């Protein structure tokens, strides 16, 4: 079975919800790219991404900051699955994550402020965190 964009995004969401890169790492292409609309330089390899993300996940863990990665769907600009990221509170939406898959590997991930995370349909699934999945449909 070939890797889909949705499966790639679920692995990314699981990484962010568990602060553990082990599920995502084997899915990354060696020439993987990671881009953010808030960062000038694009990361252009799997090894450079791992050098970047592992300390970032450790810093989040040590700070005690709350991060939520929820599966979502975009209908307009980039129709298809996405991850909706929130920080501090699960409804404090900060970014949308999009994935591109080629040859069974994740070729790139893009963190975007446009399209707005508020334009994404949120489906209440938080891969890697069963406690958060129990919150489906609940309103704060």
What label would you give each PLM region?
Residues 1-140:
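C-terminal and inter-domain tail/linker signature
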């Amino acid at each position: 079975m070939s890797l889909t964009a949705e499966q790639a995004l679920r692995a990314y969401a699981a990484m962010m919800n568990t602060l553990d890169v082990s599920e995502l790492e084997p899915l990354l292409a060696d020439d993987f790219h990671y881009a953010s609309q808030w960062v000038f330089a694009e990361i252009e390899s799997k090894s450079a991404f791992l050098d970047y993300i592992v300390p970032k996940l450790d810093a989040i863990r040590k700070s005690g900051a709350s991060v939520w990665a929820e599966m979502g769907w975009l209908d307009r600009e980039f129709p298809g699955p996405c991850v909706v990221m929130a920080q501090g509170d699960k409804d404090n939406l900060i970014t949308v994550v999009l994935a591109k898959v080629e040859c069974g590997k994740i070729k790139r991930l893009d963190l975007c402020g446009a399209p707005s995370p508020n334009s994404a349909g949120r489906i209440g699934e938080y891969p890697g965190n069963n406690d958060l999945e129990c919150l489906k449909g609940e309103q704060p």
